[in-house]
């Protein structure tokens, strides 16, 4: 890898409007995260560009369409296309969400929450194991942002996610913005959630921005990925890495995309916190903070 200016754990989401910039200018990052479904067509222009960029960057494949919570199972054609992409790119991480978005062949344009019950847990774990068997690797499961919850849930989201990890040996993608947004929407404490998640199983952290929407009943916070990372989420990140150490960290920005320089400035903020934490935890070994 020739891109060594940023700490190697810091990456950004590669979105199609930024393709040309990354392809031609190669900002000095070690890795990029893609939305897997955007690259299922092997002969598309953007897939060919990605193949060339993969010679200079590590790639993480982040899915939004496996619908791992669907009782009917994972769509076999979707899984086949994902497997072909993973086999071709050999990404260093593959991830999807603790959610569902398909039922009986009908697809919803959102990542919908699960009821946190034993039945839903069995379905979700069965689907994760099926995907991991097909890909021949563990996948990362990301905690969702949510705006409603089911009255018949019997355990918390963090208990559900922890049990998924235990039963499937999957890895975890900890989205700190999602924790913060859901904590406000549902009235739980962020620290309760974060302390319950097995840190040793977290391989990646997502950082993003959110939007506040006013309703007649009050405010709702929405994980829009259209804003800079909030000060409160930066604080959660700083606290988490101080306690648990460095992880691959992604700046996620999907809507109202800014210029690439704005995205890289957010990445630089993450890097500054990460290097400071590494240096603080290893004061006699400053080289650890140099990447």
Swiss-Prot record:
> Coiled coil: which residue ranges?
none
Stored Pfam families? MbnB_TglH_ChrH
- What SUPFAM superfamilies does the database record attribute to this sequence? Xylose isomerase-like
- HAMAP family, per the entry: UPF0276 (MF_00697)
Family per similarity comment: Belongs to the UPF0276 family.
Return the protein name. Answer: UPF0276 protein VV3194
Species of origin? Vibrio vulnificus (strain YJ016)
